[in-house]
Amino acid sequence: MKSVGLRLRPAEGAFPGVDEALAGIPGVTREGIQHLEWLADGTYAMLYRVSGGDEVAIGEVLTAHDEVLQHDMVSAGADQYYVFVNVAEQESVSALLQILDEHRLLLDPPLRVTDDGLCVTVAGDGDALQAAFADVTDVEVPIEVEWTGGYRPGEPAALSRLTDRQREALEAAHSLGFYETPREASFEDIGEALSCSPSTANELLRRAEARVVSSLLDG
């Protein structure tokens, strides 16, 4: 089973409708979408995680929005909220979800909102992922492939970005004590564990570390 990380770049940095409305509330930052369900009537049930802003102001914006059919909020700590919304269908969003359905692919939450767009992880059969990406070229929303890798349910997203060989290198380095202080293993030790040269072990580990750090800092 494979997974791919995609970055969606909607116009103006938000999808039309409730996403755009939340983005426009002063002080509010959309951190991510924890759950997204495409319901039988065509509407969406979504659970946003947001930070900042005022709970009353957020509620007023959602109540006044024509496309919001239902909404609710729950506090997640200081200036943190989970926002549930049931919203009317958007053609651009449904077009993307339809592609996932047609190719029997999984949308692996959460969907992470960053300054550069919406980061999404999709998982499924490798051939189906390739076929689906060919279809998304016809969708209005610009989409970029950020990374590809294996898929293990419940695994941190940062590890999903690694190739099998990079994962092996990182696991070997960790188990051998490469990250201990003082360091208990060398590239020679890692190379021996992987049946490769020290220089190859170094390269695999460097690339794995770069992908993990990029995932943690860039979303």
Question: What kind of region is each of these model predictions?
Answer:
Residues M1-G124:
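DNA-contacting interfaces and partner/effector-binding or oligomerization modules
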Residues A173-E180:
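Short helix-to-turn junction characteristic of helix-turn-helix DNA-binding domains
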Residues R207-G219:
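Short, Lys/Arg-enriched C-terminal cap helix and immediately downstream tail that follows
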Residues E184, I190-L194, A201:
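Short alpha-helical "recognition helix" segments of helix-turn-helix
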Residues S197, L204, A208:
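Residues within the DNA-recognition helix of helix-turn-helix
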